């Protein structure tokens, strides 16, 4: 491997939507940072059968609906 081309790999704490925490290694953030998830495997519609509502992060879902909402099948 070449030296000094890879990102810093360190431990972070991940907090799931139900409050469960675990420590993992990642290139995200800095050593000791906490990553709070908006959606995780326990709440993601793909894994729960679509029973959960979608989280509109930054208005992306609204923007999509405004742009493509009038297209019918």
UniProtKB/Swiss-Prot annotation:
Pfam families, per the entry: Ribosomal_L31
InterPro entries: Ribosomal_bL28/bL31-like_sf, Ribosomal_bL31, Ribosomal_bL31_A, Ribosomal_bL31_sf
Record's keyword terms, sorted: Ribonucleoprotein, Ribosomal protein, RNA-binding, rRNA-binding
MF-aspect GO terms: rRNA binding; structural constituent of ribosome
One GO term describing the cellular component: ribosome
GO biological process: translation
Family per record: Belongs to the bacterial ribosomal protein bL31 family. Type A subfamily.
PANTHER family xrefs: 50S RIBOSOMAL PROTEIN L31, CHLOROPLASTIC, LARGE RIBOSOMAL SUBUNIT PROTEIN BL31A
Described purpose of this protein according to its UniProt entry: Binds the 23S rRNA.
Name assigned to this protein: Large ribosomal subunit protein bL31
Organism in which the protein naturally occurs: Bartonella tribocorum (strain CIP 105476 / IBS 506)
Name of the encoding gene: rpmE
């Amino acid at each position: 491997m070449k030296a000094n081309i890879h990102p810093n790999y360190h431990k972070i704490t991940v907090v799931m939507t139900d409050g469960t925490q675990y420590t993992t290694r990642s290139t995200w953030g800095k050593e000791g940072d906490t990553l709070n998830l908006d959606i995780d495997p326990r709440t993601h519609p793909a894994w729960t059968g679509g029973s959960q509502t979608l989280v509109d992060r930054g208005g992306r879902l609204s923007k999509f609906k405004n742009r493509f909402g009038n297209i019918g099948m």
